[in-house]
């Protein structure tokens, strides 16, 4: 039997584009599960649903994404296995060096890195990610850096996919 130690619902509204996200998060002794729906009303708009399963250290075990936009349904399954990352069941050796996953349309992925970042100002974490474009569900290797500026501010720096993009993220005690 798994004990549920924390269960919450979080809403995010995008500031850069028109859209919102509803995320249900459950934390148990065995790990974390995040299920979410993202709605984007930019352009033709789209809906993205995901089911993200994490281990007790907040590292991705699996991530299933379902995208609906312009009358087209897309699906993507990412799995961490003992032999490496699988994308829709196929091993991707080009992703062997990555630490975790980043979806372009959700701030939740920042939480995974921030929870592993040190608590002291100046603490820094740089690692590879599988970057998933929310519109196309394409997946590529990328690199990111997180720098703790203060207890509640973390600087995000993209080092590959959106090279040069930086943002200060205001965070609570949960990341």
Where are these regions (language model features)?
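Hydrophobic/aromatic beta-strand elements that line small-molecule binding cavities or substrate pockets
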Residues: 22-25, 49-53, 144, 167-169
């Amino acid at each position: 039997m798994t004990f549920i130690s924390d269960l919450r619902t979080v809403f995010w509204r995008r500031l850069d584009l028109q859209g919102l996200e509803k995320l249900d998060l459950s934390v148990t002794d065995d790990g974390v599960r995040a299920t979410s729906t993202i709605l984007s009303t930019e352009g033709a708009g789209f809906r993205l649903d995901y089911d993200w399963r994490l281990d007790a250290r907040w590292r991705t075990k699996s991530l299933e994404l379902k995208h609906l936009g312009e009358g087209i349904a897309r699906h993507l399954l990412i799995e961490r296995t003992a032999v490496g990352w699988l994308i829709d069941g196929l091993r991707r050796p080009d992703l062997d060096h990555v630490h975790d996953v980043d979806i372009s349309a959700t701030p939740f992925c920042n939480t995974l890195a921030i929870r592993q970042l040190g608590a002291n100002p100046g603490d820094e974490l740089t690692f590879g990610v599988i970057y998933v474009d929310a519109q196309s569900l394409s997946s590529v290797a990328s690199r990111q850096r997180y720098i703790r500026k203060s207890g509640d501010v973390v600087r995000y720096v993209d080092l590959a996919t959106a090279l040069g993009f930086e943002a200060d993220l205001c965070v609570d005690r949960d990341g």
